[in-house]
Amino acid sequence: MKSTLMTASLLILVLLSIVDYASVYAELIDSEISMERQWINACFNICMKISSDQKYCKSFCG
């Protein structure tokens, strides 16, 4: 009984650490995507001020 309880507790701790790691990793990916969007928007805005060619700026900035 005691070993079953310890095994269950250990399993719960492992599962909680996996869920915690997954949520931190998801936040990291989300922040990277957000930073990439900010970079693309800034690039596009600067390009439009310089060239005013929307097609060129879209292809240049991604």
UniProtKB/Swiss-Prot annotation:
Keywords tagged on the record: Disulfide bond, Ion channel impairing toxin, Neurotoxin, Potassium channel impairing toxin, Secreted, Signal, Toxin, Voltage-gated potassium channel impairing toxin
Record GO cellular component, one term: extracellular region
Subcellular compartments: Secreted
GO MF annotations in UniProt: potassium channel regulator activity; toxin activity
Predominant location category: secreted
Propeptide position ranges: 27-36
Coiled coil: none
Tissue expression profile of the protein: Expressed by the venom gland.
Signal sequence bounds: 1-26
Comment field on protein domains: Has the structural arrangement of two alpha-helices stabilized by disulfide bonds (CSalpha/alpha 2(S-S)).
Protein family: Belongs to the short scorpion toxin superfamily. Potassium channel inhibitor kappa-KTx family. Kappa-KTx 3 subfamily.
Biological role stated in the UniProt entry: Potassium channel inhibitor (Kv).
Identification of the protein by name: Potassium channel toxin kappa-KTx 3.3
